Amino acid sequence: MKKLLTLALLLCTTLLSAQNKSITEWQEIDTLIAQGHYTSAYEKGEELLRKAKRKGDSHAMLKAVYKGRIAAAGYQEEHIEASVKAYQDIIPTLQGVDKSIAYTLLSVALDDYKNRYQWRNEQAKLTKELSPLTITALLGATIDDLTMWSAERFADAKRLCYEAALAEEKALKATKAGDYDLLVKGDTLGLRLRPTLYDVVMHAIIPSNIYLSNAKIKNLLYDHRNQLYGTAEEFISLQLPSDTLSYELWQLGKLQELTRYHAKNTDAAVRAHIDHRRMKAMGYMQGCSDTEVLQGAYIEGLERIAESYSNAPTEQAMFLFKLADYHQPTIYEHSGKETVERELEKAAKMEQYLKRIRQIAPQSEWAKTGEALYKRATHP
């Protein structure tokens, strides 16, 4: 019995030692990156990647590649091209959720490449695409291939990445974010609030802006403005037309799906984050269809959403600030009488929203940001 206890203690000590060493190794990469020792950090990442491959550890492989790419960006001139290749190579060896996240990271790398070499994409518009893009072709595409891709081809690649990522939908919904927060490129607020990896992937699908490209979307926006700009419940009730050719409709469908998924979430911060993302996207859309009717619906929608958070002061303050920001006055020396009167009305509205923020959430970041907004607006 004594021998068994000794053996068990030795085994536990060995496991803890190995675990601590692993934690230390990841911390070492982070420290090297923070100190600007990018080459050393990259080499450490490659070392951990080889170790993870030997063990068949899917998550460690993804983590090593991701951290290695961060390090490479600090000193490699063609780090974007290398990132595309790294994720293409690692995806087939990953499993489940790790593979989903890798697909979203590949889509980010492809976006970076497209944006960096936009002039090539413009020249490639006349390039004839010989065959539809598939996952196999996407993972096998060389950098030479990418130089000949049109903007439409990159959009197809992004769509394929997202569809492949969501193939693990059940696993994503059941997995807590935890350590994956560190692996996903996105805004800090979203990473902190998002409760599942399903949201991580969905968040990547929803852009910060949506540009209208066809009459169908513009008509939809106008005819269903109360639902599109309304509360989460109103937005969910909207029947979107099925049109796979419309990129904007596809985006709206994914946004609606995410809203529906969290409709009964008791965490106000999570719901508010999703509503904020939705209204941000809708704000860009109404900006593309610049009519007073749509702008009015947008403002009314924001007001309804703000009221829906009456039991969550901080979240309500966020939407009130959005309203205040929208009502910033713009008066110039040469502005006419009508313009001045209109802008003064906006200024009065802005003050009302800011006053309410101070009343319901005086210690919130929105109260502080509101003070700065007021100073900018009144002392330009």
Where are the model-predicted features located?
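Extracytoplasmic/secretory-pathway proteins
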Residues: 22-380
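Bacterial Sec-dependent N-terminal signal peptides
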Residues: 1-24
